[in-house]
């Protein structure tokens, strides 16, 4: 999982990067089998905390860049022998985050009290 954000962002890897890695791990292991399973490391996230040496087979690694005024970019890289697949989302304007928050607030108005995440909002919008 490769991610880039503005130079003042404090966490690395970001919460979104960790969520993407968890989803990839669950897809690999199957629903409900990824909880607590090894396979996600912060290798490469920060030079001062990156472990030395190669990652283990099947382990999901991270690379984090903090530079300039980058709004946000996340790439999930899938590799195989002689091939690579990059899936990238790039936020070019922080206004998209405000639009997402407003859409979530509107969606919540018609829901019973409970704990929801943005995944619930996105799934509801794609199923309508």
Task: Specify the residue positions occupied by each region the protein language model found.
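C-terminal substrate-binding/catalytic lobe of Rossmann-fold NAD(P)-dependent oxidoreductases
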Residues: 1-128
């Amino acid at each position: 999982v490769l991610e880039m954000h503005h130079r003042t962002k404090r966490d690395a890897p970001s919460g979104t990067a960790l969520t993407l890695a968890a989803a990839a791990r669950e897809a690999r292991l199957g629903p409900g089998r990824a909880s607590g399973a090894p396979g996600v490391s912060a290798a490469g996230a920060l030079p001062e905390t990156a472990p030395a040496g190669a990652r283990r087979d099947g382990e999901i690694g991270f690379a984090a860049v903090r530079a300039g005024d980058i709004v946000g970019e996340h790439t999930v890289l899938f590799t195989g022998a002689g091939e690579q697949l990059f899936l990238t989302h790039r936020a070019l304007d922080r206004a998209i985050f405000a639009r997402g928050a407003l859409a979530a607030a509107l969606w919540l108005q018609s829901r019973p009290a409970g704990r929801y995440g943005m995944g619930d909002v996105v799934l509801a919008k794609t199923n309508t």
